[in-house]
């Protein structure tokens, strides 16, 4: 795993050095960590916007400090307080929500507050990470940790009016597991998410 994370960081650094915008499409949310590390090296005033069903703020998960359940906590370790903006959150341990109260800007259940966050960030460099389990499992069951009560596709499309105003310097879409949705509907939705993001951030 360490080799894979190092490779992701190196490739992200190369893309950024060419003054291009990294856009990763991946399965495990942990791969966001090295990409944010590389982006932070170039943009020390970086902010992170996270769309996700889960806080991902555990100190450790199954005795591992590097995991999809700890990725945002590891990012906070070097990014610091007030730099992480979480939306759609509807699952997490009590300790994670307490940590968020003190160290991140957490918005439960939906994307309410996004417009205000975008207005506050203005031209600040932003890394956008979208965990696809932010969507309701009724429309996106193909993910490892689905959570009821998520957003729907048109809510996401509407959010892009705000997202398009941001200075997004890198981004990713993650946590699609096609094997968990043999209908192909989740894969189709993931493809539409990627397409709409490309159109929004041009």
Each language-model region and where it sits:
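Conserved alpha-helical scaffold segments that buttress catalytic/binding sites
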Residues: 1-202
């Amino acid at each position: 795993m360490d080799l894979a994370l190092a490779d992701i960081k190196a490739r992200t650094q190369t893309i950024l050095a060419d003054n291009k915008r990294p856009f990763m499409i991946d399965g495990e949310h942990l791969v966001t960590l090295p990409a944010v590390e590389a982006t932070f090296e170039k943009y020390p005033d970086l902010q992170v916007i996270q769309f996700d069903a889960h806080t991902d703020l555990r100190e450790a998960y199954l005795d591992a400090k590097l995991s999809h359940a700890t990725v945002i906590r590891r990012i906070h370790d070097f990014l610091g307080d007030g730099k992480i903006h979480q939306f759609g959150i509807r699952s997490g341990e009590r300790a994670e929500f307490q940590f968020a109260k003190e160290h991140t800007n957490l918005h439960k259940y939906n994307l309410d507050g996004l417009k205000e966050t975008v207005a506050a960030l203005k031209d600040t460099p932003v890394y956008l990470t979208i965990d696809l389990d932010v969507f309701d499992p009724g429309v996106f069951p193909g993910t490892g940790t689905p959570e009821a009560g998520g957003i729907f596709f048109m809510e996401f499309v509407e959010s892009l009016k705000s997202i398009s105003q941001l200075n997004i310097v890198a981004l990713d879409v993650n946590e699609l597991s096609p094997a968990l949705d043999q209908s192909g509907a989740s894969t189709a939705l993931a493809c539409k998410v990627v397409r709409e993001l490309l159109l929004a951030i041009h």
